[in-house]
Amino acid sequence: DQISQTFKDLSEKLNLSNTDFIRTTEQRHIKTVQYLWNELEKNGDIYLSNYTGWYSVSDEAFYNNNEIEEVDGKKIAISSKSSVEWIEEESYFFRLSKWEKPLLDFYESNPSFISPESRKNEVISFVKSGLKDLSVSRKTFSWGIQVPNNKNHVIYVWLDALTNYLSALNYPETKDRLFKKFWPASIHLIGKDILRFHAIYWPAFLLAAKIDLPKKVYGHGWILSGEEKMSKS
């Protein structure tokens, strides 16, 4: 509540306005996330297994071995320099590997989908290196949106958070005025550190759920302070 109010206060000081302010704790969002989960599961794109690997709490992201380095005896993510921990737990997975070719085909058919060109090349290179199925639930904490029909699992934050683009437009009510007017989105303007989530994972979720993709994803750089990013996104 405190952090949410801080954003509202800052917007007022900067004389910024918005037509809606959505929080992922709202019932309309929870309803949309669980509906999307059920659609993905119904289509065979979610299954239960076990996850073993590196996870960064601060980045809220999973990392492969080639994305990790050791500095002063501690394991960190190469891209963000955030500490990572080794976890082993039961998890639901999204069949991301299934969507490797459809994603590459989509990028080729829609060359302006990712901008600038350097970001597009990063994404295509990452996808071509081979996509592994993505862990989309956690058991080690209780806060978050519960997996439908399994109270022991909480939905992974990025599947949850990305869905706010749809819940703000009252999805799955596709005939709703807001959804018809604003989806597909003209552009997702995001920081380069969350490009993978918006240009790979999010499009794969949407393709699997048979939902139109946004028209463009633009990954901008960071404002630096002492050669480190000031903003998370």
Q: Where are each of the predicted segments found?
A:
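N-terminal, helix-rich and Lys/Arg-enriched segments in bacterial and organellar proteins
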Residues: 7, 16, 40, 73, ...
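Short, flexible segments with low predicted structural confidence
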Residues: 11-12, 74-75, 177
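Short secondary-structure junction motifs
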Residues: 18, 51, 212-214
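Structured secondary-structure scaffolds
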Residues: 23, 28-32, 36, 79-233
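Short, polar/flexible loop-turn hinges at active-site or ligand-entry regions and domain interfaces
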Residues: 43-49, 109-114
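Cys/His-rich short segments
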Residues: 44-100, 104
